[in-house]
Amino acid sequence: MRVIERFYFSTVGHIKAIFLKKTLDKSIKIEGFALKMMTFFKEAFQVNRKSYPERVRSALFHAIKKTAANLDACVKVPGKDFSRKRKLPLQTMLLMLIGMGGGSLSKELYDWFGYTPSTATASAFVQQRNKIRSKAVEMIFNDFVSSAMPTMTFRGYRLFAVDGSDLRLPSDPTNDFSLIRNAEGQKQYNLAHLNAMFDLMSKAYVDVTMQGKKGMNEHKALISMIDRSNIPGKVIVLMDRGYESFNNIAHLQEKKWNFIIRAKESYGMISNLQLPNSEEFDVDTTLTLTRRQTKETLALLSAYPERYRWIQPHTTFDYIAPKDPKMYDLRFRVVRFRISGGCYETVYTNLDSETFPIGKIKELYRLRWGIETSFRELKYTIGLSCLHGKKTDFLLQEVLKMLYTQTVLAFARKTTAGVWTFFWTYLM
């Protein structure tokens, strides 16, 4: 945060110096220059001393204070953990977990306490940290994002991408959550899978779920992020073909969210659909799902395979119970378009065809690549590929801390870009 503040105030100083020189060189009336400067800072920075770093810091402190007040939801043993007055109360611990740098724990503690004799020990910090549920940091992250993230839209829609990425963890043979056991004689290792929902317009993460690699299920992770979201307004979610499923589309449909999902080309939902034999097309489709195997449904399945689909008992579909006789309709478009290299891509979407014709669908789906770029930055620039904790809760705390860092940087870029755009177009 101090780095952002220094950047902000140094930037303001440079702007003043540049314009002072320009004013003197061109003999511009000082009154006119002062008026422009006042207008610039009022519009670009909202000069009521509520600068960008201050707004971010205020949002973060509010989120931490709000979370710490809900003590029972934050600790592993309610009524016992953090019940006594200590050097490291819950609010201080939450601040430190998010604000500490990459130095050794002892150095970070000395920096935090100002090298005073009352500095808490590393052992005390670890003991206190072990009492905190990872949900506490998750609550802070969600509250911070919802209050500080600028709402940026594409034609009035929030634009999200969902994807997953593997994380190599410090070796820990006792951690069943992430341990991967290879064939006898080969070295074991620890691997987790990060599932994320990424705002493509603000370049910030809005939700994450971490799973052990051996038990990962991207479909469950997606559904949990959809169902628990309280984001208002119109939303478009972009996903790769790994997320194609009846259940995922049904959850998006029930949420009244729009989607663009890349289709599997030779199998999956696209099989048995009646589609044009052309290079590009846009077809409205309705699939009716059932778990019944009565004479009536079997006749429908046989006569209209492009419309009716039978869901097997072991297949997950949350809107028809195993013996429920009802049917469920999925409505979407099947859109095929040309991409680079003479190749073609097919996607499913429930966006309106008049507002979003083939060209717009192609443009939107191409934006999905933003989450891949963000994963690379998160791992290799911010340091997500170099996690230190071994316990599952500690790991998730570190992941959320780095997501917070990435989110702050994303907000800073957006704010700075807007400032400089205004700077060059309005003042120069």
Regions found by a protein language model. Give the residues of each.
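Single, function-defining residue in the core of a domain
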Residues: 2-103, 108-111, 116-120, 125-132, ...
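Conserved beta-strand elements of the Class I
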Residues: 158-160
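Short, positively charged patches
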Residues: 179-180
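Short Lys/Arg-enriched helix C-cap and helix-to-coil transition segments
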Residues: 136-151
